[in-house]
Amino acid sequence: MAQFFKAKPNSSKQLSAKVSLQVTRLDHLGAGIAQHNGKVVFIPGVLPGEKAMVQLTEQKKRYSRAKLLNLETHSIDRVEPKCAHYHQCGGCDLQHLSLEKQRLHKESALVSLMAKLSHTEAEALVPAIIGEQWHYRRRARLATFYHQETKRTTLGFRAQSSKEVIDISSCPVLAKSLSELISPLSKLLNQLASRRALGHVELIDVDNGQFVVVRATKELSDKDKEKLLSFAQEHKVNLIVQGNEGELLVIKGPKELPFYTLNSDIKLSFTPGNFVQVNGEINRAMVDQAVQWLDVKADERVLDLFCGVGNFSLPLAKSGAEVIGVEGVPEMVAQARINAKQSDLSDVTFFHTDLSADLSKEPWLGKVDKLLLDPARAGAFESLQWLKKMKPKSIVYVSCDPSSLARDSEPLLKHGYKLKKLGLVDMFPQTHHIEAMALFELS
């Protein structure tokens, strides 16, 4: 029997439809939620209580998406975005909401996700860890794009849900020293003969100065290197070129790697590409709270999974306890060992392990008194399948995605742990990103 294509009735008309909707709340990603024809509609850039004229852009069985055309009413919580690039750049998405309401929204979203996905509530919701709302980022990666037609390179952040690079002149969430580099750096890149071979540019502001790391897919000419050196000297920054294989060419810089300190006596060095928390002020407070919550004693054994370069491991080792740090990136494990040595901490050992793999034969797997987890957005679900082998009395889980925290809470609850404390860590003001810290104790 022949079958003929039959277009869905009015599908194109439905997508181009302009409708006026009442926004009731925000989802955990910061988008406004409204109702239309019995379905939820997600609308970026709007706030609860606002009425907005929108255009439908996507239709699914259970929900739709729309873009804001204009506001018909304004929320009292709406503020004027500080950034001139806010409506094009995809870096921030909540600058239009007052800071107080941003934090209340994030706390509410965190508690709601935990209740919905893990069916549990914390015995205590602790005060959020908060800091400066502007100029807090000590590190950022800017994208570049070479335009074949104009022979120019654009430097900036990508647009929301797009590969397009937005040309920016400054950034109010970057450290001032880094934000002030963007315009002259953009001018410099467009003077290089090898500008079409440039990748991303990393900006770092830490204890031993500002670093500019330029990714290049081929070796730069001597003239280009001279221009980079002149820029570094004029702006008093360290400048490094990173090659295709990760090799580093220091154009101007100190003999030591970038580093930051914790508690004045713990020095954490890292190489470009290593993960470190971008908000130094919040990171220090977060580490202090984790150490306080775990309350480690000198005779205890502590396991730090996803330990990075030792951000939590080394402060925990100051207690005199035996600390074991485990990390999946070998270069970071090597750096963590160096950091322990330069901070004169001998009771800490680091292992390289793929924490999503079979851990049964790992030498470090065994009974521990305390456990700290600081995984990436994917969470620590696979690692927690080995909880019976570890049996810690207390667990601190530092999360950069409340959905994975809620999911990972399930095996903890099944093994007899209770959620004793939960708190927001506002690592990224002006964005929807939610970081959190949770304390679980064996009941």
From Swiss-Prot:
[4Fe-4S] cluster binds at residues 83, 89, 92, 171. Transmembrane segments: none annotated. One of its GO terms (molecular function) is rRNA (uridine-C5-)-methyltransferase activity. The keyword S-adenosyl-L-methionine applies. Its EC number is 2.1.1.190. It comes from the Bacteria. Residues 12-70 form the TRAM domain. It catalyses: uridine(1939) in 23S rRNA + S-adenosyl-L-methionine = 5-methyluridine(1939) in 23S rRNA + S-adenosyl-L-homocysteine + H(+). Keywords: 4Fe-4S, Iron, Iron-sulfur, Metal-binding, Methyltransferase, rRNA processing, S-adenosyl-L-methionine, Transferase. The active site is at residue 400. S-adenosyl-L-methionine binds at residues 277, 306, 311, 327, 354, 374. It holds the Pfam family tRNA_U5-meth_tr. Belongs to the class I-like SAM-binding methyltransferase superfamily. RNA M5U methyltransferase family. RlmD subfamily. Catalyzes the formation of 5-methyl-uridine at position 1939 (m5U1939) in 23S rRNA. NCBIfam families: PRK13168.1, rumA. This is 23S rRNA (uracil(1939)-C(5))-methyltransferase RlmD.
